[in-house]
Curated annotation (Swiss-Prot):
Source organism of the structure: Nostoc sp. (strain PCC 7120 / SAG 25.82 / UTEX 2576)
Protein role: NAD-binding protein involved in the addition of a carboxymethylaminomethyl (cmnm) group at the wobble position (U34) of certain tRNAs, forming tRNA-cmnm(5)s(2)U34.
GO molecular function, a single term: flavin adenine dinucleotide binding
Compartment(s) of residence: Cytoplasm
Protein name: tRNA uridine 5-carboxymethylaminomethyl modification enzyme MnmG
Protein family: Belongs to the MnmG family.
């Protein structure tokens, strides 16, 4: 760290953002749009908003985060809607709480468009530089940054969004080199600065699979994975939607030969060879981790996904590895359809420094240094969507800090974004954190479809939602409210022609009459059915129809979830048996069983605060304890 009295500043800004990945871009755009003079510093101006791993946005829980960032006025959802190669709704056969939109994106187009956006944003300057030091004022508040080559910039707030670049080292087998990503040098000096300031730092690991030439692949041996015929959107702003031709993805599977090659060469991987001890992401394991952890699985799904419309590279999803390069090609060629593949880039593992986010307030400002914020992978998360969500939170609060306004804490009951930040700042997490729907006890309330209803009023209050977006939002909510009133008030009689048709086609009688709302509550009956019988409202958009239907159809479930939340709160002081073997509680997630058995919490409240133990696990544990107690009272053998 450098003290203020020994520094000559080249220029002055309100906010400086260090790192121009998905977190840094959201943070910088937010502060600039809120009127702060902002400087965005990056190691490479040509890699702004780069997608170094899977070029995709969305998926379970991640799509909810993307919708929420958009609802606040952020950019990631718009980018995915403009640059997608394919879109699919995952979990569509289940309830709307777990519906997940996923877009395969064109990585070069995505980066080029985001670069153009940040380059042309008012109040935002971008520059290539490596930040190595923070400049502190007389009261240990941040007042600037210093670069590797000795240039200093003054500011009132700094947002660190350094990704995997702090002390980054990439591994292929037992070979390593300093790098944040393949071909890009690591950031030096900043970790040491943070350590000198008293911050705890740790090491984490992630990895990315090889890329192969699409012209060397035989798709006829793979299963086609087309996009959805009906395209859905991340952004609530129809003006940014771009209808475009979709490209197919494909699926293949590992073979006994794949597994043999990996098992016989495990000792050559960075982790199993003992050269890397950093924890990797539990929910995105390397292929060697899968073979070791799931011994009884004969085969694993591998998805073959295009990286762009006009480039030959294919991303081999589910096949990340740190094994030696010469072995990687043998492994790839053991997959059906890839027998003659040409490898364009090898897979590699990367380890990097991170700051456990318990050192931050829920505003994402650090507790030790006023004006210093951290967001994204440096906080121990994994994923572009998690990074973008933290970026907009840090950007909003840095702007408010600069203006001496009260900073905003996003409550976990209002958003996945709030759940994410709350988990990071309160739980001692020692492995990369990925957002999951099970991490939220409010997931029925926190759906993709109502992210605007939950967060756009706040985005408007903050200053990120303009008049046009606000008018669109208020009209949509008025339409949904009015339609719900109509559905509750309008009745169909059993002797009407339409009533007879509905009873006949659904094999469910109508006794006397029924409201349209009660029809929608019937299993298998949807708004499209109302349209079919001429009972729908043709003036509504698909999103408005869906919003009204979900609110009505799931009203009972929403009330039940609220009751469960209140029950967990009441049970916080409930004692847990000291002899309880959590490995035998099958209704707990595997991660929860591991963590609970290790910590042996004394109460339900303590169990709920353990990293990796989700609200769904706590609910399952309460049910298990009730069953255990019930059996004990009946004099039956106690459950194990």
């Amino acid at each position: 760290m450098t003290m203020h009295n020994s520094v000559e500043f080249q220029d002055a800004f309100d906010v400086i953002v260090v790192g121009a990945g998905h977190s840094g871009c959201e943070a910088a755009l937010a502060t600039a749009r809120l009127g702060c003079r902002t400087l965005l510093l990056t190691l490479n101006l040509d890699k702004i908003a780069w997608q170094p791993c899977n070029p995709a946005v969305g998926g379970p829980a991640k799509s909810q985060l993307t919708h929420e960032v958009d609802a606040l006025g952020g950019e990631i959802g718009k980018m995915a809607d403009r640059t997608y190669l394919q879109k699919r709704i995952l979990n569509s056969s289940r309830g709307p709480a777990v519906w997940a939109l996923r877009a395969q994106t064109d990585k070069r187009e995505y980066a080029a468009i985001m670069k153009n956006i940040v380059e042309n944003q008012e109040n935002l300057s971008i520059r290539e530089s490596m930040v190595t030091d923070l400049v502190l004022g007389a009261n240990d508040e941040v007042i600037g940054v210093e670069t590797y080559f000795g240039v200093a910039f003054q500011c009132k707030a700094v947002i660190l969004t350094t990704g995997t670049f702090l002390g980054g080292k990439i591994w292929v087998g037992n070979k390593s080199m300093p790098a944040g990503r393949a071909g890009e040098f690591a950031a030096e000096g900043l970790t040491e600065t943070l350590n000198r300031l008293g911050f705890e730092t740790g090491r984490l690991k992630t990895g990315t699979p090889a890329r192969v030439d699409k012209r060397s692949v035989d798709y006829s041996k793979m299963q086609l994975q087309p996009g959805d015929a009906e395209v859905r959107w991340f952004s609530f702003d129809p003006d940014v939607w771009v209808e475009r031709e979709q490209l197919p993805c494909h699926m293949t599977r590992t073979t006994p030969e794949t597994h043999r090659l990996i098992r016989e060469n495990l000792h050559l991987s960075p982790v199993y060879g003992g050269w890397v001890e950093a924890k990797g992401p539990r929910y995105c394991p390397s292929i060697e981790d899968k073979i070791v952890r799931f011994v009884d699985k004969e085969s694993h799904q591998i998805f073959i996904e295009p990286e762009g419309r006009d480039i030959p590279e294919l991303y081999i999803q589910g096949f990340s590895t740190g094994l030696p390069e010469n072995l990687q090609l043998q492994m790839l060629r053991s997959l059906p359809g890839l027998e003659n593949c040409v490898m364009l880039r090898p897979a590699y593992a990367v380890e990097y420094d991170y700051l456990p986010a318990t050192q931050c307030y829920p505003t994402l400002m650090t507790k030790k240094i006023a004006g210093l914020f951290c967001a994204g992978q440096v906080n121990g998360t994994t994923g572009y969507e998690e990074a973008a969500a933290q970026g907009i939170v840090a950007g909003i609060n840095a702007a408010r800090f600069v203006r001496d306004e009260e900073m905003i804490v996003f409550p976990r009951e209002h958003s996945y974004l709030g759940t994410l930040v709350d988990d990071l700042c309160t739980k001692d997490l020692r492995e990369p954190y990925r957002m999951l729907t099970s991490r939220s006890e409010y997931r029925l309330l926190l759906r993709s479809d109502n992210a605007d209803q939950r967060l756009t009023p706040l985005g408007r209050e903050i200053g990120l939602i303009d008049d046009r977006r606000w008018q669109m939002f208020t009209r949509k909510q008025e339409q949904i409210t009015g339609e719900k009133e109509r559905l509750y008030a309008t009745r169909v009689k059993e002797n009407d022609d339409v009533g007879k048709a509905i009873a006949s086609n659904t094999q469910q009688a109508i006794k006397g009459s029924i409201t349209l709302a009660d029809l929608l509550r019937r299993p298998g009956f949807h708004y499209v059915d109302l349209d079919r019988y001429g009972l729908g409202n043709p003036e509504l958009t698909p999103a408005e129809k869906e919003g009204a239907e979900i609110d009505i159809k799931y009203s009972g479930y929403l009330a039940r979830q609220q009751s469960q939340i209140e029950q967990i709160a009441r049970q916080a002081q409930r004692q847990l048996p000291g002899d309880l073997d959590y490995t035998t509680v099958d209704t707990l997630s595997k991660e929860a069983r591991e963590k609970l058995n290790k910590v042996k919490p004394l109460t339900i409240g303590q169990a709920a605060r353990i990293g990796g133990v989700n609200p769904a696990d706590i609910n399952a544990l309460l049910i298990y304890l009730e069953l255990r107690q019930s059996k004990h009272q009946k004099g039956l053998a106690v459950l194990p």
